[in-house]
Every structure is written in structure tokens, then in C-alpha cells.
Amino acid sequence: MIMELFKIFSMRIFREFFCVFGWVQPLRPQKDITFLTLCDGTGYLQVVLSGRVVKSTVELVGMLQVVPEGETAPGGHEIIVDHWQLETNPSIQADLRHLVLHGEVASAVLRLRAALLAAFRQTFVKHSTIEVTPPCLVQAMVKGGATLFKLDYYGQLAFLTQSSQLYLETCLPILGDVFCVQESFRAENNHTQRHLSEYTHLEAELGFINFDDVMIEAVICESVDILLADPSSAALIKQLKPKLQPPARPFLPLSYVDATTWLNEHGIKYIMVEHTVGNDIAKAAEQMTDIIGKLVFLYRFPAELKAFYMKRMPQKEGSNVVFTASCDLLIPNVGEIVGGSMRISDYDELITTYKQEGMDPSIYYWYTDQRRYGTCEHGGYGLGVEMAQTSYALKGFMFFVECDDIIYVLRLSGLGFLH
């Protein structure tokens, strides 16, 4: 509505009264009048009135005019209010936390999220990668049975998906490189700043590649370039994280073994003892990345720490550790935002892996058949959008969910609840 008013005013329709609705943003009280900014989702409008209405919903009737010379206002216009009516009061927000979405910060975060997803999609289109929409209800687990949300699917056991990767692999023979932006679910009852039961998962699968061709770096850097080149999203980033700089390329590559050595040399322990090959170094690696101060590509993790579908590297003579063609991207003060790998493309190797992991191959018959009928060397990765957004905006959040009569706003941020 506000943007439409500006268009009408540009046609030189003067001395008309308009009725506008919107939400009151922070106001600036003066001696006799109060200036406030009204937002309706399409834009901002300066309003002149009296009263205490910050973050309330109001109906305003008044005359639109250009701001006086020497003064400024959003859009260069203001409305002199003749009549106003309070629709809702802000005082209820303390008890109804799902209303924290009302405000400039929440608006900026959601707008930046939309711009981020658009930038990712633009980057994939540039690289001739096609978007597909895999199912959210599945019967095959990807990451492990302990983190599955189970449900009854017309008398059969089904799950909310942990990842769309297996389905993306089935699209390669008919579409080539593919990606999806899909919700993923993890039944991990961890109440931390870095755990979400539901999150937006950007995943890609690429055919006829080797380990060096997994284009995580290109997607991250090119998407950030798109955001910073667009005036609207650049303004949002400046508002939320003024000192953000594009990530320096190339990212720092560091093997799992070298990272283990680095941790021991810098006194970062594993449960009070030094790290050894085979330990899960996830939390310690985040500390390491914070100290190094740049984006780090960790690669070649032991097979016992990674998923069944990841391609195994040739085992070195005399070593009892099998490594995978896998990688994680870690960002300082954020943590892991991307995990990727080459996939097992050999039928016999995949069957052997099922047995080693104690998995029932019959459940994955459709996935296994991809290796029997026209497979290729392929790999891919998954990126958590909420985690990625924290690196661009310091803040990221999910919409509220209702559970047992208690409303929770699910957040992913190091800064506590939005205010």
C-alpha cells in the first residue's frame, strides 16, 4: 500500500486524504508532535501524530505530502495524520513470544533470507543445475535411525526426511546436475543454539566429477557476490552485519589428519587427552577455525565418522583406517555450514557397505539399482540455510511451533532471542 501511495503522489494528485494501515516502527517524540515510521511490508512511510503506539498496529487517515526542504524521511514523503485508530497494543508481546517477528530486525532477517535463497538459485542456474522437489515423507534413512521422526503412513512406517540426497542421485541420469531447497528434519533433542529439529536444506548432486570438482566454494562465493551487488540485499547486510566481507578465495584446505595434529599442537584436547585418528573432532575443529580466522575445508574423514554412501579412498599399506572422499566447510564463529562427498558408484562396494553398517539392502533397492543401470562418478553436498545466514547476518531464525500449549520461537543465533 505504501509503495502504491508513492506512485499515486508521483502523478501529482495533491490534497487528497488517504487511509493507510501498518505497523509502527521506532518513533521520535518531539515537544508537540511525534514522528513515527509506518511499515506495511511494501515500504516505509513517515507519519506525524501524537500518542504512544510503538510496534502497535494502527489505522491512519491523513494527507500525504513531500517532506519539507532540508528534512529526510523514508521515500521522501510523510503523511500528516488527521485521524488515527489503534488496532492492537504492543504490551501483549511480553506474554506472546510468537509476536517477536514484529519489528525491523525480524523483517530484515526474513528479507535477507529470501534474497539469500534467490542468490543460491541464481548461482545454480548459472552453472546449469536444475531444481527438483524430492519428497519429505520417506522410508529410507540417510544419516542414522536415532535421529528420525517416525510416523504412520497408511499402516506403514515412514519418516520425515533427514536429507534429499538419495533422491537427487536418482535424477542425475535424466537431468544432469540437480539441486533442491527442501526442509529436513532431525530428531535430536538438543537445546542448543546450533540445533534445529527442522531446517531448510540446500542440497546439490553433480555427475561426472571428481573430488576437486565439488563446487561448494563457487556456490558460496558467487552467492555472496550476488547479495552484495544488489542494493536491497546489500543494505540489509549493512544493517545486520556492517563489517561483512566477501569470503577470501581459495578456502583453506586441511585434511582430517593434519587437523588432528594441529589440535594437539595447540593444546585442544579430546576429553582431557590428545586427539588420535578416529576421534570425532567436530567441536574441536570449530575452535580451530575460530583461532585460524578464515574459512576452512576439512577433508578426508575416517569412514567410521561418516555416512554409508560416501566413497572410500584407497587404503594405505599398513594403515587400519579407511578414509572417505568427504569434506566439511567451517566458518569462524559459526561452525560447519556445508558437508559434502563423492558417492559410492560401484555396486559391489555399496553392497559391502550395507553389510558393514548392518543395513537392510532391500529397503534401498531403488538406490542400489542406480549403480546397476548407468551410473557415473558423482558427488554432492548439503548446506544448512539457517547456519549460512548467521554468517551473513549474525541472526537467523525459524518460525514458531506450538507444542503442549507452549509456544517456542526456534532460533539459530549466538545473540539470544530477537527483541
Q: How should each PLM-predicted stretch be described?
A:
Residues 1-419:
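Class II aminoacyl-tRNA synthetase catalytic cores and aaRS-like
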